Regions:
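Short hydrophobic/aromatic-rich beta-strand segments that constitute the beta-sheet cores
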Residues: 45, 76-78, 109-113, 250-253
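Bacterial N-terminal signal peptides
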Residues: 14-27
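Mature, soluble, non-transmembrane domains
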Residues: 112-277
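Hydrophobic/aromatic-rich structural module bridging two neighboring secondary-structure elements via a short loop
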Residues: 78-130
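A short, structured loop/turn motif at beta-sheet edges
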Residues: 34-38, 66-75, 101-107, 212-214, ...
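N-terminal cleavable signal peptides for secretion/export
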Residues: 31-91
Length: 277
């Protein structure tokens, strides 16, 4: 799941993605046997809490997410629609369309973003990034500055590779995972330092009914996101989610410090995988 930032109101809404995928987006490398299950999911989002300083009275919205497998990589698509209601009676509406492609070896990543709202001009841009084994030095390019490369940290992760490594660490019983993560967003927000805490596997039980996509257990994961250029010890936001071994997220929360939202899975279906030679 990729983070969305709304500077006018002083907060961000995520895709882990960061998160998922931010938050919901993840990759495999050539040597890894794990495969993520292609699927399409719809999440309903609501405000959990808000400080009085935000003047927020409610947040509602929906996230439509899909993970599609291709023979040479994965395609992720996310469509957000969020409505922020304030005590003054004002309403802010944000719509975002995001799509990315990540190569199966984890070395290539491309993305496109289309964002609109009722308080800022429409925003459209795309870009791509390389990292080993495709190139010696990781770097990214953006359509708004096509002739200027953004250097990336040597050990940078793209979203899908980050989550598969996270899953591998969870399987081994490891609890902590720190990494630099590249998102498909604007250059000044494209790199975030992350600290992940991986909880003990929990029985799925009746928490999530997802048909053939339901796994016997999930890992509770919390990821804190930091600006690598800042010395602040407090994260910009934190993403907590239930991650199944097949890559499906059955529930997630995002905490921005002054307010938080959660996302309940309301619809999900498996998507076909390609037949590759």
């Amino acid at each position: 799941m990729t983070p969305l930032f709304f500077p006018k109101y002083g907060f961000a809404a995520k895709s882990l993605a960061s998160v998922v995928g931010a938050m919901l987006i993840f990759s495999i490398t050539a040597g890894q046997a794990r495969e993520l299950t292609p699927h399409k999911a719809i999440y309903e989002m609501r405000m959990m809490s808000a400080d009085s300083e935000t003047q927020l009275s409610d947040v509602t919205g929906q996230n439509e997410f899909s993970l599609t497998r291709e023979c040479d990589g994965y395609v992720v698509a996310e469509n957000y629609l969020l409505e922020f209601s304030y005590g003054s009676g004002e309403t802010a509406i944000i719509a975002s369309q995001f799509q990315s492609w990540e190569h199966i070896d984890g070395g290539l990543y491309s993305f496109s973003v289309h964002e609109g709202s009722n308080f800022e001009p429409e925003k459209k841009f795309d870009g791509y990034a390389y990292r080993p084994p495709q190139v010696a030095e990781p770097e990214a390019f953006f359509s708004m500055q096509p002739n200027s490369a953004l250097p990336l940290p040597n050990a940078v992760y793209f979203p899908l590779a980050h989550t598969l490594d996270l899953l591998d660490k969870a399987d081994k019983g490891e609890k902590l995972f720190s990494a630099d993560l590249f998102f498909g967003t604007e250059p000044d927000k494209a790199i975030r330092r992350t600290n992940s805490v991986i909880g003990k596997a929990q029985d799925t039980g009746e928490i999530a009914k997802m048909g053939s996509l339901t796994e016997p257990f999930y890992y509770p994961v919390q990821i804190a996101y930091f600006d690598p250029k800042s010395s602040e010890s407090v994260p910009e936001y934190e993403h907590t989610f239930h991650l199944q071994p097949n890559g499906v997220i059955s529930y997630y929360e995002i905490d921005y410090g002054d307010f938080s939202v959660d996302a309940q899975l309301v619809e999900i279906e498996a998507l076909p995988a390609p037949i590759c030679s």
